[in-house]
Structures are given as C-alpha cells and as structure tokens.
C-alpha cells in the first residue's frame, strides 16, 4: 500500500465491553473484585511460603514464582481497563499498547514454562524419590527459573519488535479490553503474512514444547503410580500432583478455548469474553486450588492468619497481612 495511506499511530481505542453502557458499573465492580482477590490470594501464598521454613522446598519455590507471575499477568491488563471504565476514556497510547503486548507475552510464557518445570519437579518426586533432593537442588531450581525468564523476555521482545515494524491504517479500534496481539495485527494496512507466520511459528514452538514436556512427565507419573501396589500409596502419590494437574488443565484448556472460539466465531465480543477466562479467571483461582488441595499450605495459612489476628497493637500493616490471608483461609475450611 502507498505510504500516503499510512499514518503515524499515536493511540488506539480499546472497545472492550462498551456495547452496553448500563453494564459498565457492574463490569467495573466485577473486574475490580476479581483483581483484588487475585492479588490478595497470590500474595497470601507467597507470604505463607516465605514465612514457613518447612515450605522452603523446590515445589513451593516454583509455586511462589508462579504466584508472583500471576499477579504480574493480571496487572498487565485489568488495571488499564478499570481506569478506562472509570474515566470513560478508552484510549491507550501506541507506546502503552506495545508495552502491554510485551508484558502480556512475557507473563504468558513464564506461566507456560513454570507449569512445565513444576511438572518435571513432580515427575522427579514420584518417579525418583530417593534422588529427589540430589536432582532438584537449589542451583538447578534457580537455573530453570532463570532460563525461563531469559527465554520469555527474549520471545516477548522479539514479538514486540515485530509489532513495531507494522504500519497501521486509520482504523485503530481494538475490539478487546486490552491490546491482544492477534487483534492488533489485524489493524495493519500492509501484508502481515510474514509477521503472522513468524509470530504463530514461535508461539506454537514455545507452546507445544513445554506442553509435550508436561505430557511426558505425567505419562511417567501415571506409569509409576500404576506400579504402586497399595491403594493408599497410589492416592498419596496422586495427591502430590493433583493441584498442579488442575492448574495445568485450566491454563491450557482456557487458552486453547479462546483461540478455537475466535476461529469458529467472528464475534470480537465473544473473543474478548472468552479471553477473560485465561487472563483473569485462571490467575484468580490458582491460589485457591493450591490452598484447597494442599494440607501444608492450608496449615501455614491458618497458622499465619491466627498469629496476625492475635498480634498487637493493630496497625495498617497488620490489617493488610490479615487481609492477604483471609480469602484462602475462608476457602480452607
């Protein structure tokens, strides 16, 4: 297309859930509540793991990292949407949009890699219990998390730079509540085939390889569990990875469901609604899944909350710590 028909983009319009103005207060309250529950729930998991030396193990080290990433993940999209609803202004700057895309991709990939590492951790714990502490030493745990960050940062940076190279036309409305990469690419006024090809190739590569690792880990885990003779032993072995399996299923099923629904349905509103499942709901329910299914986390949360309640004198910090543990504490009973 001729360069005269291109424009220097300064901002985009996030249409989000603006079709019905009467529902804006309800949507604002709902997303604010989910955001607060997510942040408080994941902070409570992190505080519980840090405060109890018994939880200073590889499994909980990875869980605390996952909770931190989930806080960052939901903070990438929801606060901007809440500000837009509050100010009745759906504008996001070009720089803000690219930045949002970068952090969105960064934390999605980190979630992906951390879930894979946690699957490997469960594989070693169940299939090689006698060598667990030797294999999953602190150096390896730190190295795996560091590599996950490096790969995720480079991938997000690469995808963002690909976005920067795209020329955009005058139609700059994004039918989403955040700068979803696929929606932004559709606004380009040039042939984006190469960009689409590269972006989808890297996404498929970075999604299928970790997923294959998870499948392999659980294949070996199931094989080991089936070889256990006692029913109690089978239940104990399975219970150690039940929470992780639930989170993995939720993360991949919701993410896959979004893109399948987008391909089958041309409704942008339906795509935006479906994406709420993996961008908001998944980070919100993760701490509750681990709290409900994990006796160690439940006991630490109860113990920490009780200590904060009886501690005196009351202060703002005291109130905040109690508030952080309250959601998971309620669901633990």
Swiss-Prot record:
Keyword flag Glycosyltransferase: no
UniProt main location, coarse: membrane
GO-annotated biological processes: signal transduction
Name this polypeptide is given: Olfactory receptor 1078
Cytoplasmic face residues: 51-57, 121-139, 220-236, 293-333
A Pfam family: 7tm_4
Coiled coil regions, renumbered to chain: none
Residues the record marks as carrying a glycan: 5
Homology family: Belongs to the G-protein coupled receptor 1 family.
Organism for this UniProt entry: Rattus norvegicus
Transmembrane segments: 26-50, 58-79, 101-120, 140-158, 197-219, 237-260, 273-292
Subcellular location: Cell membrane
UniProt tissue specificity: Olfactory epithelium.
Gene Ontology molecular function, alphabetical: G protein-coupled receptor activity; olfactory receptor activity
Gene: Olr1078
Keywords for this protein: Cell membrane, Disulfide bond, G-protein coupled receptor, Glycoprotein, Membrane, Olfaction, Receptor, Sensory transduction, Transducer, Transmembrane, Transmembrane helix
Protein's membrane topology: Multi-pass membrane protein
